[in-house]
Amino acid sequence: IRGARYIHILVPCPLGWGAAPHDTVRLARLATETGLFPVFEAEHGEVTDSSKIRHRVPVEEYLKPQRRFAHLFKPTLQSDVIARLQSRADRNIRRFHLLPEEQG
């Protein structure tokens, strides 16, 4: 393919995200396993490949370990916001075909 290429990489920031430094790899993995940050390749705007989710997890598991999302859980659970985030993750999973066929 001629022309520019673009790579978007998720790199957890322990200080900015309010998460433990030893959790950075786990948070990056959770971001993909929830469907919030799909890993895929595209050419000319068309998805050509995607990394399948091995173990699907709800978005809450990704949000809870991060202090930047604490307002979604305390003082009261913001279930409407979490549901919208889950809906977005579910849409990504369908759009990018992230589940193996037997889980689809």
Task: Show which residues each predicted segment covers.
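Short, conserved beta-strand edge motifs with alternating hydrophobic and charged residues
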Residues: 6-10
